[in-house]
């Protein structure tokens, strides 16, 4: 793998990460609207999760590649900093996943509340078993 190939791979990871952040922002924007589209929110959320998985797998590939091409000589410095960076990145990924889960729960509550309000305004549907 040439240096240009490595840079191109890292560039594609960066672009995927930007797509991931864009999707998260679009999902949040959709949830903040007064009239939320559940389909649009789910589409953006699914795109976010897909992009996040791609970024995670590509970064893992790069880490594995770097491990394989290492000289095999013991490192004179400490590996603590790299391990800490990796740990913090993993923590951030987990945090983002938990925030997405919270957003999904908020979305469900919002949709349920909206449905209740619509039912109260329009009354029960004729086929819903209401007394006539």
Swiss-Prot record:
Cellular-component GO terms for this entry: mediator complex
Predominant location category: nucleus
Entry-linked InterPro entries: Mediator_Med11
Location relative to the cell: Nucleus
Transmembrane portions of the chain: none
Gene3D superfamilies: 1.10.287.3490
GO BP, sorted A to Z: regulation of transcription by RNA polymerase II
Pfam families in the record: Med11 (PF10280)
Superkingdom, natural source: Eukaryota
GO MF annotation, one: transcription coregulator activity
Keywords assigned by UniProt, alphabetized: Activator, Nucleus, Transcription, Transcription regulation
Function: Component of the Mediator complex, a coactivator involved in the regulated transcription of nearly all RNA polymerase II-dependent genes. Mediator functions as a bridge to convey information from gene-specific regulatory proteins to the basal RNA polymerase II transcription machinery. Mediator is recruited to promoters by direct interactions with regulatory proteins and serves as a scaffold for theQ9P086 assembly of a functional pre-initiation complex with RNA polymerase II and the general transcription factors.
PANTHER family: MEDIATOR OF RNA POLYMERASE II TRANSCRIPTION SUBUNIT 11 (PTHR22890)
Family that this chain belongs to: Belongs to the Mediator complex subunit 11 family.
Complexes and interactors: Component of the Mediator complex.
Protein name: Mediator of RNA polymerase II transcription subunit 11
The species this protein was found in: Aedes aegypti (Yellowfever mosquito)
Gene: MED11
């Amino acid at each position: 793998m040439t240096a240009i190939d490595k840079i191109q791979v890292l560039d594609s990871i960066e672009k995927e990460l930007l797509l991931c952040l864009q999707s998260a922002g679009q999902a949040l924007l959709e949830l903040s609207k007064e009239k939320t589209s559940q389909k649009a929110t789910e589409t953006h959320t699914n795109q976010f999760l897909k992009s996040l998985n791609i970024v995670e797998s590509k970064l893992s590939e790069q880490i594995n590649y770097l491990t394989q091409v290492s000289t095999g000589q013991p490192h004179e410095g400490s590996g603590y900093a790299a391990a800490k960076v990796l740990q913090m990145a993993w923590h951030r990924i987990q945090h983002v996943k938990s925030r997405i889960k919270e957003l999904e729960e908020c979305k469900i509550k919002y949709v349920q509340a909206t449905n209740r309000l619509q039912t109260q305004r329009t009354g029960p549907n004729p086929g819903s078993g209401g007394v006539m």
